[in-house]
Regions:
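A short alpha-helical cap/connector motif
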Residues: 1-252
Length: 252
């Protein structure tokens, strides 16, 4: 199973986007007056989406849907939206995990995905991110933070240390192909029950048509994991893609 486009689908998307381009992220790098005011996705839209995800998973798994993992935190707007939604829905069992180096994109990002990324894109310090969350009425102390580059932090040692064993929602917003691949390899062994995977930059810069970025990483992941099937669900904006992941049951 995969979600690769055939030639007709590629051509159709190319023509459509020529006249209706996918919106770019509103901010990448450089100084801004107040980084906490930047919302790459409107918070209310994200809250509505997360509430929908919770309902989908609760129909399948019951009240305890599992933990929330976010890869690429930036100023905390996404993880803050999930936190507030979970509190509103009384998901007391859900834990929150934020994985980020808090230094923006790494240097090698410039050599990936048709050169669309630059070192330092989406940089927000850990201290500033905490301030942003406090201003959103989010208790950052109730979130588990894993700071560092993914090639150093996404490993079995941290799986055991964090006691990761039940995943509910995964928000992948780390942009590059290599980072998305590391994330998927990390969570793959944990996908033993239904979960929802959200790819924030699936169509950004038309990387899906170019067979790069998150599009490439996810399709390769599905190729390597035939025990998993994916069903696309409605996502929160045009540039993103979201999927319900289901382990294939062995009835033998």
């Amino acid at each position: 199973m995969n979600f690769r486009y055939n030639l007709i689908q590629k051509f159709g998307r190319l023509i459509y986007r020529k006249f209706n381009p996918v919106p770019r992220s509103p901010w990448t790098q450089g100084k801004v007056k107040d980084i906490c005011e930047i919302n790459l996705v409107p918070p209310e839209r994200l809250k509505s989406f997360f509430a929908h995800c919770i309902k989908i998973l609760q129909k399948i798994k019951g009240k305890d849907i599992g933990d929330y993992l976010e890869f690429g935190v930036f100023n905390g707007s996404s993880i803050g939206s999930m936190y507030l939604t979970a509190k509103k829905e009384n998901l007391e069992s859900m834990r929150f995990f934020g994985f980020d180096a808090f230094q923006g994109l790494p240097k090698n990002a410039e050599n990936e995905d048709d050169g669309v990324w630059k070192k330092g894109f989406y940089a927000c310090s850990f201290d500033k991110m905490q301030e942003c969350l406090k201003r959103r009425d989010v208790n950052y102390k109730q979130i588990n933070w894993v700071k560092g580059w993914y090639n150093k932090t996404l490993n079995s040692k941290n799986i055991n240390k964090l006691k990761l064993n039940k995943i509910g929602i995964v928000f992948i917003d780390c942009d590059t192909y290599s980072s998305a691949k590391l994330v998927l390899d990390f969570i793959g062994p944990l996908l033993k029950e239904e979960a929802i995977l959200c790819f924030d930059d699936w169509k950004l810069n038309d990387l899906d048509i170019k067979e790069m970025g998150e599009y490439k990483a996810f399709n390769e992941f599905l190729d390597k994991n035939p025990q998993l099937q994916a069903e696309e669900i409605k996502s929160y904006n045009r540039k993103s893609k979201s999927f319900l992941i289901k382990p294939i049951k062995n009835n033998i």
